[in-house]
């Protein structure tokens, strides 16, 4: 089955759910209707719907159709189970996104940083610091490290837009897996300087290790979030 076909259908239906063309608790069009609309096979439609189920957007009901269970929320909603770019998250939440690069340099992984990040000591890395604005507020401080061997040609201009878009569509590398750790920490002087803290003295910190299709670590990132706009969502299914 062509991956691009079912992914295109998945993204199309997902976008319509987020736009509330298919509102919460409504039923999606029947399989036959979707097959006709997208000019595809039944298996392709079912694969697209399975992706939406995995994302928590719909729930299948045996013999009764597919019900929408996605609800838009007021806070910025990140997903734990998927890998999204900042721009994709902003679009999904209907927010205006701006990225400002505050540091862009090359560093060498020290023994201490190698133990923390998973890179090897002596690895040459891009070190990128970016402030993420949503609807005009500085809410996220991203501190990224990319292995230069796997991300050649990265520039500050690219970093101000989407590094993942560059990696996937220019370099042709597949981004497959991200391991995440979420904690709460006291805000640092850097957080208070760069983020709109609104009186908070702590930040939510998401640490990511991201791997390509060969299972190689190419990114280590620490994202520091202003708490008032921090909300991560996961989907859990009970198995018996």
Give residue ranges: language-model regions.
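Beta-hairpin "wing" of winged helix-turn-helix
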Residues: 54-63, 69
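Extended, compositionally biased flexible segments
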Residues: 59-60, 84-87, 91-95
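C-terminal all-alpha effector/ligand-binding and dimerization domain
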Residues: 96-240
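Short, hydrophobic-biased segments on the C-terminal half of alpha helices
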Residues: 49-50
């Amino acid at each position: 089955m062509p991956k691009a076909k079912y992914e295109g259908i998945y993204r199309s239906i997902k976008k319509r759910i987020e736009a509330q063309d298919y509102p919460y608790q409504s039923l999606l069009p029947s399989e036959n209707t979707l097959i006709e609309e997208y000019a595809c096979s039944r298996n392709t439609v079912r694969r697209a719907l399975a992706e939406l189920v995995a994302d928590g957007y719909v729930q299948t009901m045996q013999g009764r159709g597919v019900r929408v269970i996605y609800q838009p929320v007021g806070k910025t909603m990140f997903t734990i189970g998927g890998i999204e770019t900042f721009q994709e998250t902003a679009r999904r939440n209907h927010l205006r996104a701006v990225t400002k690069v505050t540091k862009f340099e090359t560093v060498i992984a020290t023994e201490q940083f190698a133990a923390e990040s998973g890179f090897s000591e002596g690895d040459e890395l891009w070190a990128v610091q970016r402030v993420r604005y949503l609807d005009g507020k500085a809410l996220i401080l991203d501190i990224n490290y990319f292995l230069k061997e796997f991300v050649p040609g990265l520039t500050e201009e690219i970093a101000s837009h989407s590094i993942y878009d560059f990696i996937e569509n220019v370099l042709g590398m597949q981004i497959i897996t991200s391991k995440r750790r979420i904690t709460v920490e006291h805000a640092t002087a850097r957080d208070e300087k760069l983020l709109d803290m609104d009186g908070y003295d702590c930040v939510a910190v998401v640490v990511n290790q991201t791997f390509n299709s060969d299972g190689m670590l190419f990114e280590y990132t620490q994202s520091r979030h202003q708490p008032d706009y921090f909300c991560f969502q996961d989907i859990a299914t009970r198995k018996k």
